[in-house]
């Protein structure tokens, strides 16, 4: 049996989540969505996704602040930070493990990556 790759999207913008979910379902990924950092962390621990998309600014915290912890716990996950602006990342955050996407994310741009 072929295992489908898993994608977790943590973003409070419902429309963006639905668009990305539709995109990844068409590519035969399993897709999970969370709209808060707390819910996203719970889902992350439950499913250990292959790909994580996390919004920079969520209602209950800043997504990038949790990235070092996520890197350690999930070293095989590919991390993608979503932001409405090009953020300045802290020096202690390993940018080599991270792809930054600026909103709005185009499906064409995703096609170049996935």
Regions found by a protein language model. Give the residues of each.
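Conserved acidic carboxylate
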Residues: 11
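Two-component/phosphorelay signaling modules centered on CheY-like receiver
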Residues: 14-32, 98
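Acidic, metal-coordinating helix/loop segments flanking the phosphotransfer/catalytic sites
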Residues: 33-51
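Acidic catalytic/metal-coordinating carboxylates
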Residues: 36, 62-65
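Active-site residues of response regulator receiver
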Residues: 55
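Short amphipathic alpha-helix used as the core "switch/output" element in two-component signaling
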Residues: 64-76
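Hydrophobic/aromatic residues positioned on beta-strands within the core alpha/beta folds
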Residues: 82-84
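C-terminal output helix
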Residues: 105-114
């Amino acid at each position: 049996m072929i295992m489908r790759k898993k994608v977790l999207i943590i973003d409070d913008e419902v429309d963006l989540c639905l668009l990305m979910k539709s995109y990844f379902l068409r590519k035969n990924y399993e897709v999970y969505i969370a709209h808060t950092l707390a819910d996203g962390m719970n889902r992350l621990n439950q499913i250990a996704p292959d790909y994580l998309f996390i919004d920079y600014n969520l209602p209950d915290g800043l997504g990038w602040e949790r990235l070092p912890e996520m890197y350690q716990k999930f070293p095989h996950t590919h991390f993608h930070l979503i932001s409405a602006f090009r953020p300045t990342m802290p020096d202690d955050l390993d940018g080599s493990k991270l792809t930054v996407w600026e909103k709005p994310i185009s499906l064409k741009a995703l096609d170049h990556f996935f």
